[in-house]
Amino acid sequence: MPVKDLTISGFPVLKESNPHPERPQKVGFVSLGCPKNLVDSEVMMGLLSRAGAELTRRAEDADVIVVNTCSFIESAQQESVNTILEMAAHKTGGKAKRLVVAGCLVERFRDQIRQDIPEVDAVVGTGELEKILSAAGLEPAPAPTNGRSDSPFVVLPSRPEGDARAAQGRFSRESWDGAIGDLPNYLYDDATPRVLATPGHMAYIKIAEGCDHPCTFCIIPQLRGKFRSRRFESVVAEAERLARGGVREITLIGQDTTCYGDCLLYTSDAADE
């Protein structure tokens, strides 16, 4: 899904952090797949904007093109490959100087992408969103501080069920050539900048990531990692900020939302308020 109306959510663009202040890098995004993947695209666009990049909806105007891919089913994989090849044409015969491939297809075919599509300059997996800055040729901007004291929560890496299944090899990716051995564990929070690509009145909030159930028919745990929840206060803080920005419809999403909070040890009554 190409980026539509872009709205900075949470933090201003810091132009001084751009290593090329005379002409900001123009970055174009193509986001494929589910709303959860769209949130990942919004996070990467937020990080790029904070670093001084200029986002564009026109691939022909972009210096850097990012394709955030899906590989849940075979048809999604093919759509991702076709889109990468389409965007590669803007590099070989157009203005673009860099082509970055991100998302689930990278987790499954990391080495094969770079081997078979030499136009690809960098890949960014689902657990590596913050690497989008170096992948796009930008230096990271200083992270904003949120002024919070230490969190009243202890966050476990995953649910005990997920840890037990991992110990049994149920999440193994050893058979995937080029796959990173460790499962993705990235999880954005309310301090992470986002650029909304949804209509102005609505937004998604990803409250959790990953899944602990390695069903035979599903590849999500290998692509997204074990289940992990965001802190309750973090979700509320993001919702409040979105509301202040004019959002009136918020959809909470995750691979397994019914398990939200199972991996959090609460030491406050915030969830009951």
Residue ranges and their predicted role:
Residues 137, 272-273:
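Residue-level marker of positions within ordered structural domains that often coincide
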Residues 266-271:
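Conserved small/polar residues in nucleotide/adenosyl-binding loops
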Residues 1-261:
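Proteins enriched for Cys/Gly/acidic motifs involved in redox and nucleic-acid/cofactor modification
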